[in-house]
Amino acid sequence: MERGGTRMKKFEYTPPEQPRELILKLGQKITDRIGHTVTAEDPEYYGLEALVTDEMAEVALKMKVRKPMTLAQAVKATGKEEKVLEELLQEMSNIGLLEYNWENPKHEKQYVLPMYVPGSAEFFNMKLDQIKEHPEVASFFERMAFLPLQKVTPMVPPGGAGIGMHVIPVEKAIETENESVSVEHISHWLDKYDGKYAAGPCSCRYSRGVLGEGCADDPEDWCIGVGDMADYLVETNKGHYITREKVMEILQRAEDNGFVHQITNIDGEDKIFAICNCNVNICNALRTSQLFNTPNMSRSAYVAKVETKDCVACGRCVEYCPAGAVKMGQKLCTKDGTITYPKHELPDNTKWGPEKWDMDYRDNNRINCYDTGTAPCKTACPAHIAVQGYLKMAAQGRYTDALALIKKENPFPAVCGRVCNHRCEDACTRGTVDQAVAIDDVKKFIAELDLNSDTRYIPPVVQPSNRGTFPQKIAIIGGGPAGLSCAFYLAARGYKPTVFEKNERPGGMLVYGIPSFKLEKNVVDAEIEVMRELGVDIKCGVEVGKDISLDELRTQGYQAFYIAIGCQGSRKAGIPGEDADGVMSAVDFLHIVSGGNEDYRVDGRSVVIGGGNVAIDVARTAARCGSNEVSMFCLESETEMPASKDEVEEVKEEGAAVCCGWGPKEILTENGKVCGIVLKKCLSVKDDTGRFNPQFDENETMTVKCEHVYLSIGQSILWGDLLAGSKVELGRGNGAVADPLTYQTAEPDIFVGGDVYTGPSFAINAIAAGKEGAESIHRFVHENASMTIGRNRRQFIELDKENLALEGYDNAKRQRPAMDDKIDAHRSFRDAHRTLTEEQVKIETARCLGCGASVVDPNKCIGCGVCTTKCLSLIHISEPTRLGMIS
């Protein structure tokens, strides 16, 4: 069960039998719920009752809502002694019941009884200790941002009609608009209130956290008060003065994080009192348009538009759009013509009630694509890398941009350019024409930048905090692709994670499992060095569970753990003779040789049992270690072999015999050493239900003489004492049981990923899991942040390749990298595969059909411009009509 939950916490509140009469009257005075009579069960009562004394209520009842009153006027109205009243008014301001105003001819301090939202409900929630002591004020804010609007929202015209908050676009997105509205420019308001700015905490982030629906942002300093509000925040200890330069830093950080700029919208076109930087997952103001499905409640004067012909389908706009207005679609025409995408229904000419609302908007706005699908490459990739995007960038010579785009999802592009199982290529639409685009070869070319310390790409740290990097200590147990990916994305978000690796060098199976003739270790080292420069601390030679325990790490201050130790053990065949000298597991053999001992000798004949890529790696490695005859035996037929076709062809080219349909029966020994193996005929591998259940003909056997037998029939997890005393449950294959979305185990601070969760799998799967683990841990270490709300489920749909009208494509053949003729590709441990030339990359990237494109629904767009800060091709916002702010 996640910490914080996905549903709002209910604070304990029992209406009193004898309500405080003055609080009822004050609640009724301020409420904007038309025709509603406030009772002790209402938020108007329990919100005020928590903080407001009867004496305060008496004074407030002498005031008019939103009508400024000087101290002298208050003395006259209440009959109280001036000094006593001034102290009381100050206390009322400190808790948030009152605000200040100096906008009068004498520039005289005036006290204002504000409305609830925006107003006292927010001010109540700008002091965390106040909310924690009285969580009912958090509910008060949430309810008063909801209840008064239920019947109003369908009638709100563009611009917001002076209700609540108004989205103001990213200024860079509208700089080129010739007739842009001045009030839609943040600079207009900063100029108007020049020199009078203060930063305070976000009341939405604070209050939603107390209610258990928080995000993982640091709440401090996202609310920028201007003019009188700046002074109010400082004088009531809710904020601090900042310079214009600091304002710009906060605004830029907000844009980097995908937050939406909003300004207050209750004082007409000539006045605001705050600029907020809002996370849609917790913002009560953005909720008014998103939950009620009425964009006019928020939208600016602008709407986004994608230039489809230029869109590279990177999907960044989709990922960040707070309103779910952008989704992935397709650029290619179907046999019936161009796809027309549905538009969001609006309340303009439709009866609008609760059945039209979207209570799950935070999750639904994270749906990535239309049901008709998008680019197959992005869909098929476990990490959902923007393949089409980086191919187009490479075609334009924008190699650093392409590398940056890949690293949004994969910190190991150079590694994956060499050893990925390229499901993107298997799914590539171009493959229906001739041959798939050589996606991994292009990725390898791009990632060559990472092998040079002068050109490698180190992503900027983007943390949702205005107070620097996060202090929480996080431990990653296992330095393989899952663990290192988790560390990479945590570091990119502002953490300083520590990786504990039991081996002498990090990399896991990338170093100790994949032979150097496929993946040179300097390639792995270079990409790990990027992580170090990003802030990841890697401690090698430390086995957690042996050298130090999880509990000891907790005492050192570690708040979360990501366990990704992989499957380092082997499985036995359960046959006679498998303990003989000369029998070795594939994992152990590769660990010795790939881990740095390439001088290891294998004399004589070798038999490899297994039909996967690991078995092929063993066969090829044995040959390089001197074995004069290598044979592979597997249960499956050649078409059923789990190994990739390319791998099978390569091992055959190197002289190994691949014998399908045989399983081990007995290993023959002489004086305790292997001298041969008896194999039995496999009739079938799976039963009628598809489960692994091999059937053999015990009478049909074959004996093969050999001196070495390598068993590549499965891997196991070596937990040791790592989980001693923990609540982590183990399931199928002795793997950790965890939530399939968050990877959180039964021990709340322990998350798992990679092979310890899935069983033996591919590097790209582990990389994808590592990024999700980082997202979960980021949420977990921030108190009361939801583990699931507003989380991108990373679900994509492949377009229908059978229903495409493919015309006018480039006729070039697939480009292939040359081999280095100075290297013996069959016996050397060096990688003989060269990289594509720049000219080949241009030819190959031109073969991409450009299947996908982002599609904007203008009816959902709120004109925030966040998409323009993420777009890597061409998306812009324009002014469809003069919507503006309504006075």
Where does each model-flagged region fall?
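Short, amphipathic alpha-helical interaction segments positioned at domain boundaries
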Residues: E108-M144
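Rossmann-like dinucleotide-binding cores of NAD(P)H-dependent redox enzymes
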Residues: V499, N503-I538, A619-E666, M787-D800
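FAD-site-proximal beta/loop scaffold in flavoenzymes
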Residues: D579-D603, D687-P760
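Single conserved hydrophobic/aromatic residue that forms the stacking wall/gate
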Residues: I875-I886
